[in-house]
């Protein structure tokens, strides 16, 4: 484990949780930026869905509530509805993902970000999110449950 990330290895995969961000149970991350928040998908989420091939965003300027859809993502494995970890107004979307959706897989905590939101009541929104350490523990439980389920299916 290094200073910037928490990491765990499952099978041959390394799952990373970046420190200094907030996380939602729906496997999105939130980064504070000058009163706005940048939202992206976690490493766990992108590994679970596989290679991302397409993403569709809402219009800039719309208001979103917590748990309301902010993107539709298509991967080689599934179609996923991505929901907002907080409430606010979408002020920007990552247009670069239209041409290179695979950036979500390649750089989930960097160039693979999804949307920029001007949050309503930032403090209240942040109180509903998890710290990196708490999300890391939740992710490990999810991974353990998936491994148990996989073991049952393979018997």
Which residues are covered by each model-predicted region?
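Non-catalytic terminal segments and appended small domains
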Residues: 1-60, 93-155
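Small beta-strand-rich domains/subdomains or short beta-sheet motifs embedded
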Residues: 22, 56, 63, 74, ...
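A structural signal for short beta-strand/turn segments enriched in small hydrophobics and glycine
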Residues: 61-76, 117
